[in-house]
């Protein structure tokens, strides 16, 4: 097996077939990924995680583990919406991965100083499925009691938020960083700011162990490196298994595909 991306699966080809073979092996790429993941579940502190994307259900287990391990959590992407809602901010017509109200309320109460949510967002109206056709773009600042209208969606973190996130990182002297999921609608150039700022934070903290993973955040970081003519390797280590990364963290590395290889 040479793919972290499938190790969380309980499929027969991943977790059962290796048990029938006398000769099983962990691939070089998978070994590299595991070494990176071990540095996340046994982090050098202080540590920070930038969590974006949409599906809370894919990230909530890892989020809890990261908090328990002392990580500062910085929220972006549509992941921001249930957290904003939990603090009674009006999220208008923004996408919401529902069903997590209770656990998010508890996390915000238990780790209020560790979970950082946006204070401003960039919004727009999406009247079709074409992600390039977003109209009436504007910023909404929650600290000024501004609200997202029912016909609007939050599509990126705002400049005040990313400034605060950057300042927090600088103040803490972060030694371990991870990013999973984009901070905005990166398919549309108007909403790449948040993801680009995360990439810039990674670039400016070369003293830290840095790993980012997931198709969209990898794409966002690659766009950043090309647009600003920066060597992508200067942004840290790229993991090709976004959900695999999350499941490794959530389960402390105890994944079906790895158990089958007896590599832990």
Segments and roles (model prediction):
Residues 1-264:
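Active-site loop-to-helix "anion-binding N-cap" substructures in soluble metabolic enzymes
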């Amino acid at each position: 097996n040479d793919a972290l991306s499938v190790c969380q699966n309980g499929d027969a080809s991943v977790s059962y077939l290796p048990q029938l073979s006398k000769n099983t092996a962990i691939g070089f790429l998978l070994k590299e990924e595991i070494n990176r993941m071990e540095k996340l579940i046994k982090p050098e502190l202080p540590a920070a995680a930038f969590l974006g994307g949409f599906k809370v259900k894919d990230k909530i287990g890892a989020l809890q583990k990261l908090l328990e391990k002392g990580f500062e959590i910085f929220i972006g992407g549509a992941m921001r919406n249930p957290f904003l809602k939990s603090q009674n901010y009006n999220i208008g017509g923004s996408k919401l991965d529902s069903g997590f109200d209770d656990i998010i309320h508890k996390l915000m109460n238990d780790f209020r100083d560790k979970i950082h949510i946006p204070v401003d967002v960039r919004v727009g109206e999406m009247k079709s499925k074409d992600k390039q056709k977003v109209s009436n773009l504007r910023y909404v600042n929650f600290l000024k009691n501004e609200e997202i209208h029912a016909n609007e969606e939050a599509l990126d973190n705002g400049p005040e938020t990313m400034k605060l996130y950057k300042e927090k990182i600088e103040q803490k002297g972060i030694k371990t960083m991870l990013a999973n999921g984009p901070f905005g609608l990166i398919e549309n150039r108007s909403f790449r700011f948040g993801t680009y700022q995360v990439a810039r934070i990674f670039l400016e903290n070369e003293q830290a162990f840095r790993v980012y993973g997931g198709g969209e955040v990898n794409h966002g970081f690659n766009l950043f490196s090309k647009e600003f003519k920066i060597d992508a390797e200067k942004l840290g280590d790229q993991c090709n298994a976004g959900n695999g990364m999350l499941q490794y963290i959530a389960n402390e590395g105890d994944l079906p595909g790895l158990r089958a290889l007896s590599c832990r």
